[in-house]
């Protein structure tokens, strides 16, 4: 009787391990990516007589981890590094403030939902937690923002390649709020490689 129960228990454990392992192989994904974006510093209102600030040459790279929650739905977590060139023009009525140039660097933690459509397409989006790591003359971009995107992917064995056009808006809820707060806005494109395990 004890031997029979032990065999049943061993059988259940082995089946459970095989099931968990096969589920795990389909439910985890690691991605690395590189991207660039057309960036702009936007205020909610236009300030007359103020200087102008521009963001150019925005580039990013990062890693992502996707955990499958349901058949087509995954949670997408990661860490992203953004670098951008800032061009700061003084107020037109004050010639003593010439044009200056700065580097903006920021680390972001995206927390997205990722939904696969059919086999080769997906949509993703959600909040972003941003930490500006450079001191700049623009309003701080540290805070909570959001992103929405769509993309295409192609799987081969356990690997995949993908492309992900996206829209991001930073500092929607800034940690340090200023009057007429500037918000970095990006229309970007990411290229990446993934591995399923």
Name these PLM-found stretches.
Residues 25, 68-72, 118-120, 155-159, ...:
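Outer-membrane beta-barrel channels and translocator barrels
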Residues 29-33, 74-78, 122-124, 160-164, ...:
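Residue-level detector of the transmembrane beta-barrel scaffold of outer-membrane proteins
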Residues 26-28, 55-61, 103-107, 140-146, ...:
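Residues that define the transmembrane beta-barrel architecture of outer-membrane proteins
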Residues 40-54, 83-106, 131-140, 172-184:
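Flexible, solvent-exposed loop segments that connect beta-strands
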Residues 29-31, 154-157, 183-197:
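Outer-membrane beta-barrel "beta-signal"
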Residues 23-78, 168:
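Short glycine/proline- and aromatic-enriched beta-strand/turn motifs that initiate or cap beta-hairpins
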Residues 61-67, 79-81, 109-115, 125-129, ...:
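Residues on the lipid-exposed face of transmembrane beta-strands in outer-membrane beta-barrel proteins
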Residues 1-31, 197:
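Bacterial Sec-dependent N-terminal signal peptides
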């Amino acid at each position: 009787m004890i031997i029979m129960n032990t065999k049943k228990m061993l059988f259940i454990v082995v089946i459970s391990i095989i099931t968990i392992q096969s589920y795990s192989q389909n439910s985890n994904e690691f991605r690395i990516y590189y991207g660039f974006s057309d960036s702009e510093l936007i205020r909610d209102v236009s300030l007359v007589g103020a200087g102008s600030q521009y963001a150019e040459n925005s580039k990013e790279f990062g890693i992502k981890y996707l955990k499958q929650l349901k058949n087509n739905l995954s949670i997408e977590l990661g860490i992203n590094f953004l670098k951008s060139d800032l061009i700061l023009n003084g107020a037109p009525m004050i010639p003593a403030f010439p044009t200056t140039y700065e580097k903006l660097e920021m680390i972001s933690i995206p927390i997205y939902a990722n939904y696969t459509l059919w086999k080769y397409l997906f949509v993703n989006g959600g909040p972003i937690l941003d930490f500006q790591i450079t001191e700049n003359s623009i309003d701080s971009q540290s805070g909570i923002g959001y992103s929405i995107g769509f993309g295409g992917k192609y799987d081969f064995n356990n690997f995949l390649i993908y492309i992900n056009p996206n829209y991001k808006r930073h500092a929607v809820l800034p940690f340090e709020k200023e009057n007429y707060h500037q918000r970095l806005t990006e229309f970007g494109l990411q290229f990446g490689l993934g591995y399923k395990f």
